[in-house]
């Protein structure tokens, strides 16, 4: 009977999508929209890299697909944004150090302040020392082991079906995305 039939195994694919609009303002010392970039590095990309590194260290057989948009990828290798990211992390460490002192007589708050101080110091270590401010290399390292599959998307993160009224625009979006990916990751993308 049908109910006794063994179900076939399949695959579930989780695809993480990493994107930020391109923001770079050398004309300003601080620019609010750039904070999104720094926060994404501290709160998302480095925690993922730490997880990938830990899985590799523990010998876990894992697979994940992640898209990194051309705008984000190019921001991640930009020297100005890399230096500003270091300054952002340094400010977080300074604030956390002050919080540890301020909360020294409040155990429950002090524990949290110390946790954040440790987290931000680890973030600085991973970003500056371990990966030389280049998170593309961190992601590429895991792609080169076959565990992480990095794909791209349209060059400006545009929705290609809506661009089909101008076929040359679609071709340009894909061509630029593939060129950017190849330059940064050393091979053509296997997906978009």
Model feature map: region roles:
Residues 2-192:
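Carbohydrate-active enzymes and regulators
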